[in-house]
Amino acid sequence: MRNKGIFVIAEMAWAHDGSVDKAIDIMKAAQEAGADAIGIHVTDIPTYMVPHYGSGEGRVSAGKEHLKVYQYVLDINLAHDDWIRFAEVARATGIALCVMPNDKVSLEFCEAHISPEFYVLAAAAFVEAEFVKAVAQTRRPTFFRIGGATLGEIESSLNLFRSNGGGEITLLHGFQNYPTKLEDTNIRQMQSLHELFGAPVGLADHIDGGDIVAKTVPLLAWLSAPHALRSTLHGIGLKRARISKRL
């Protein structure tokens, strides 16, 4: 990771809606807009989710609320060959890959076929000791999405990651709602988290944009990564993350 300047991650998540061509279009648009990395979620659905997981408003794209989440996500999940093609185009385009592998099967696939520059661990994965170890053993720089985790869970996962030879760590703090209210961001906690855990800390939430990134600069945060819906692209989890590196 860089030591100065602005590092921008555009997180696509599931905004591709099951189309690798749409995913590539989003990735290219992000690169043209100045993003340094594209964030993707790689998931083996049968490993990751139980079939009876429910649906509802705000959980899937508008108009799809009647569908079960499992079947909906299964239908829009990109195949391994799609991700390989996506990664090849990303490399040719000159944008780094920041991957959240949601399960062990996906992590093994990413290591064998994608070799991303960065990994992301969601807070829900902090209690999966073997998975945290496996990500650590890749030695790749890793973002810890700590929103929703207790201090004890963060400490335990970081200790486990570090004791298994993990790469560079960055914590991403943030209360994630759709959208996150500005008063819920609690950006001053970033400084406390940095002091507690001895790692760079950034902001990762679902605010609508604006000047929140600039407000993190006086806190001497190494990273700030608010997520904002891009008005011209619609889909599940489309976010633009701006990351300010060690100002």
What do the predicted segments below correspond to?
Residues M1-L247:
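Catalytic cores and adjacent flexible loops of soluble metabolic enzymes
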